[in-house]
Amino acid sequence: MASSSEKTPLIPSDEKNDTKEESKSTTKPESGSGAPPSPSPTDPGLDFNAFDFSGMAGILNDPSIKELAEQIAKDPSFNQLAEQLQRSVPTGSHEGGLPNFDPQQYMQTMQQVMENPEFRTMAERLGNALVQDPQMSPFLEALGNPAASEQFAERMAQMKEDPELKPILAEIDAGGPSAMMKYWNDKDVLAKLGEAMGIAVGADQTVAAEPEEAEEGEEEESIVHQTASLGDVEGLKAALASGGNKDEEDSEGRTALHFACGYGEVRCAQVLLDAGANANAIDKNKNTPLHYAAGYGRKECVSLLLENGAAVTQQNMDNKNPIDVARLNNQLDVVKLLEKDAFL
């Protein structure tokens, strides 16, 4: 049985995560106090210290992005591309800063990578986040400066000489994406890398007061989600019997029923529905448990939800109903089942 960190359902693949679109800004945020000095006006290099990356940190820590990354790391084409880049980068660059690798082979491999649906989904969500985040506008502009790549290379060279980071970077160089995934959730390593790059840590990551109590509270509050995700029927029953909220929402507005149906844990879904869980609960993207079950082809969960009054016509933020989501994900058996119910 997978752990809860390995079993977090993705947002149905039609989601663009554009519900929090913000106006773009070209105003350069101020550097954090105590940060190294910014480049002078005559230095066109990239000022890593002038940008708040907390928004991107939130995206990268999104459970759906993490699971996409894990799936991508297992893709043979992506690993081939990563190995090719690893072989070329350590050998140095030609004049002009271009890595020494075969462009034709690179393009062929990249084309294979782009055929990976998980890669396209993650690239789209990250791209949207970059474009919509006003803090990232000056960062993206700065990346266009030739001096930025030189400054980035200098930072990387310094990191490789850091006694704490050197073995970690060496392991990532040798192991590729799979080794990188090992450190994805390591807050200490990520903080050290951020510090070495001069990237300010978001305020939510710097608050150290009473961390253990907060974490314990989170775990206790999410026990219903955890047991439902893991298919732990007895644990779920015990959690509900001890006062657990059957319709408790996580930070994305997802209830335990969303999780159970996303994973196909039909017995847990039945327990929740028997306890009176809302079959039409919506998350922040207005996805219902039926959207999740339909998108992942969980036919038994779809049938169970329909028997308990789940709405086939409920639309999410992209104006997609469960039938649309199932069709987008080529879940043809589920499409037939939903269409049959819709026309009854």
UniProtKB/Swiss-Prot annotation:
A 1,2-diacyl-3-O-(beta-D-galactosyl)-sn-glycerol binds at H225, E248. Pfam families: Ank_2 (PF12796), STI1-HOP_DP (PF17830). It comes from the Eukaryota. One of its GO terms (biological process) is regulation of DNA-templated transcription. The keyword Repeat applies. Exhibits chaperone activity toward chloroplast outer envelope membrane, mitochondrion outer membrane, endoplasmic reticulum membrane and peroxisomal proteins, by recruiting specific proteins containing a single transmembrane associated with an AKR2A-binding sequence (ABS) and subsequently binding glycolipids (e.g. monogalactosyldiacylglycerol (MGDG) and phosphatidylglycerol (PG)) present in the membrane of the target organelle. Residues 1-50 are annotated as: Disordered. The ankyrin repeats (ANK) mediate interactions with hexoses-containing lipids present in organellar membranes (e.g. chloroplast), such as monogalactosyldiacylglycerol (MGDG) and phosphatidylglycerol (PG). It is found in: Cytoplasm; Nucleus; Plastid, Chloroplast outer membrane. InterPro entries: Ankyrin_rpt, Ankyrin_rpt-contain_sf, STI1/HOP_DP. Residues 13-27 have a biased composition (Basic and acidic residues). One of its GO terms (molecular function) is lipid binding. This is Ankyrin repeat domain-containing protein 2B. Binds to chloroplast outer envelope membrane (OEM) protein targeting signals, as well as to chloroplasts. Binds specifically to two chloroplast glycolipids, monogalactosyldiacylglycerol (MGDG) and phosphatidylglycerol (PG). Interacts with APX3, APX5 and TOC34. One of its GO terms (cellular component) is cytosol. ANK repeats lie at residues 219-248, 252-281, 285-314, 318-344. A 1,2-diacyl-sn-glycero-3-phospho-(1'-sn-glycerol) binds at Y296, R298. It is a peripheral membrane protein. It comes from Arabidopsis thaliana. Keywords: ANK repeat, Chaperone, Chloroplast, Cytoplasm, Lipid-binding, Membrane, Nucleus, Plastid, Plastid outer membrane, Repeat. The keyword Transferase does not apply.
